[in-house]
Amino acid sequence: MGFQKFSPFLALSILVLLQAGSLHAAPFRSALESSPADPATLSEDEARLLLAALVQDYVQMKASELEQEQEREGSSLDSPRSKRCGNLSTCMLGTYTQDFNKFHTFPQTAIGVGAPGKKRDMSSDLERDHRPHVSMPQNAN
């Protein structure tokens, strides 16, 4: 159970310690003190195999977590909508219909052609625009 929660930091630190132990110019113990049958020492090939196994287990663990997360998302309350919206045009049509209904339920505003307020007579506007302006001098002829 604890191996499933194995953090990548711990795997990386094991790798660093193994590599640091094999890269020292002067070993911690002399060659005479260490026996070749010492069970605590790993050969370079064994260290690589151990690291490969750790990485493979970590990748499998993350993949299974991702699958579980996707299964949880698939069983959420949004799944009927995703089943309904298998066709993009159906989804877009439904969304536009909802927006259109919202637009028609807004309260009416007093803006536009039929809005109450000051009404101007178009004929008087045209006459006023065609009369000479006060600041312009008129012809004496």
From Swiss-Prot:
It is found in: Secreted. Keywords: Amidation, Cleavage on pair of basic residues, Disulfide bond, Hormone, Phosphoprotein, Secreted, Signal. The modification Proline amide is found at P116. The keyword Signal applies. GO terms for molecular function: calcitonin receptor binding; hormone activity; identical protein binding. SMART domains: CALCITONIN (SM00113). GO terms for cellular component: axon; extracellular region; extracellular space; hippocampal mossy fiber to CA3 synapse; neuronal cell body; neuronal dense core vesicle. Residues 1-25 form the signal peptide. Residues 64-85, 111-141 are annotated as: Disordered. The modification Phosphoserine is found at S43. Its main location: secreted. InterPro entries: Calcitonin (IPR021118), Calcitonin-like (IPR021117), Calcitonin/adrenomedullin (IPR021116), Calcitonin_CS (IPR018360), Calcitonin_peptide-like (IPR001693). PROSITE patterns: CALCITONIN. Residues 26-82 form a propeptide. The CALCA gene (HGNC:1437) encodes a small family of peptides including calcitonin (UniProtKB:P01258), its C-terminal flanking peptide katacalcin (UniProtKB:P01258) and the calcitonin gene-related peptide/CGRP1 (UniProtKB:P06881). Belongs to the calcitonin family. This is Calcitonin. It comes from Homo sapiens.
